[in-house]
Amino acid sequence: MARIKVHELRDKSKSDLSTQLKELKAELASLRVAKVTGGAPNKLSKIKVVRKSIAQVLTVSSQKQKSALREAYKNKKLLPLDLRPKKTRAIRRRLTKHQASLKTEREKKKDMYFPIRKYAIKV
């Protein structure tokens, strides 16, 4: 089997990807048998190509699955952990902008009764 182009894989459906994956795994198994029995050198060099093709199919299928999940959870309040943006632990625990901007009653009164003085300079 020749190398697979990823842009062609992205157009395929989930069932097509799974059938292609089964075919590639079967081919890899036969190539490994040929390796043990002392097969031709061109078959041995083909193992790397087939393994890479399997990885590409698995990657595309997982990407499709993740994008479908993103669509499903698009307007929901809570997201699964693996769909949330990856940030540092400290950033994830930081206060939100709204929480940081909140003021206590005392602060509000102080700001109201003692506003910042504004001066105009005559020219």
From Swiss-Prot:
One of its GO terms (cellular component) is cytosolic large ribosomal subunit. HAMAP family: Ribosomal_uL29. GO terms for molecular function: structural constituent of ribosome. The lineage of its organism: Eukaryota, Viridiplantae, Streptophyta, Embryophyta, Tracheophyta. Signal peptide: none annotated. Belongs to the universal ribosomal protein uL29 family. It comes from Arabidopsis thaliana (Mouse-ear cress). Keywords: Ribonucleoprotein, Ribosomal protein. It comes from the Eukaryota. GO terms for biological process: maturation of LSU-rRNA from tricistronic rRNA transcript (SSU-rRNA, 5.8S rRNA, LSU-rRNA); translation. PROSITE patterns: RIBOSOMAL_L29 (PS00579). SUPFAM superfamilies: Ribosomal protein L29 (L29p) (SSF46561). Pfam families: Ribosomal_L29. CDD domains: Ribosomal_L29_HIP. This is Large ribosomal subunit protein uL29x.
